[in-house]
């Protein structure tokens, strides 16, 4: 009888253990199934004018899609750019979006992502196949490099130079941010092409000076602008090529402190928070920008790759072109501010719908983003 009771007790304990193990396994599976997607963002700065706008729209998308986001600010310093991919991969990110500086950095970034099985997409950048064939080939064959979202920077450069020429400016100085930066090189090509085209068809010739580099802070932007003006007191225009917005803030402060506000026409890329006031008072002549949703599209590419919705080729990658907006008057800016500053151009429901688009339809939605597009959805 004692033996029978012992056997029954052992069976009961074993049954309880099996049920407990089965329950724990089910709970673990459920926990795994409901694990949040985690996407890392490697950005020059998440706090300057453009960077904070990028963060705002990414955070809104992450909230709408229940995605965890992690940011690394790398200042467009090469070693920080490459280490950011390592940091985000080690932190358990399923994918990352990155705004690198030089295309050469992408060799390390892509290798890190491929080794760690982390999906990757560029924003505000694309690897040029002609100038960086090795990096391009590596990106194309990686099963984890999803694609790149970028602007037509050459066209952007041409348009800004043309705006200055049409306003009667003749001697144009140029302030970049980092020598060799992939986006700056394209904009510079556009500035030069704009000068060549203008001079080929107009008698009032214009001149573009060689670039000086002002980094990505307001202090370095200011000191570089001061040096440019002191060395070239007869300039009547300055292009501040970009750098996130702080470089321009410093350059404008330099121009005002030197008594040159309204005398030196300034154009730039990356909208300032006070662009309306700068246009009214002559601080700015024109600006291209409104492109802070570019990283949103890169985010959607990576999100859908993680979900298995967008196949990742080993013989190419997705290439998405993002449109610029151009503002040259307070009236232009008022329309922009209503739909891109006071509110975001996409609400939560629209972000969810965007995440459900095919890749081709995502490209179409990207191409048509404009003030009129947002108006039509409100």
Where are these regions (language model features)?
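Hinge/cleft segment of the Venus flytrap/periplasmic-binding protein
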Residues: 35, 299-378
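Short, low-complexity disordered leader/linker segments with a strong preference
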Residues: 1-38, 111-116, 364, 373-378
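Periplasmic-binding protein-like
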Residues: 40-42, 92-100, 119-124, 173-176, ...
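Flexible loop/turn connectors
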Residues: 261-330
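An alpha-beta-alpha
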Residues: 39, 43-45, 58, 146-202, ...
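Hydrophobic alpha-helical
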Residues: 96, 101-115, 191, 214-277, ...
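Extracytoplasmic "Venus flytrap"
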Residues: 36-61, 65, 70-83, 87, ...
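Flexible loop/hinge segments that line or gate small-molecule binding clefts
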Residues: 111-155, 177, 276
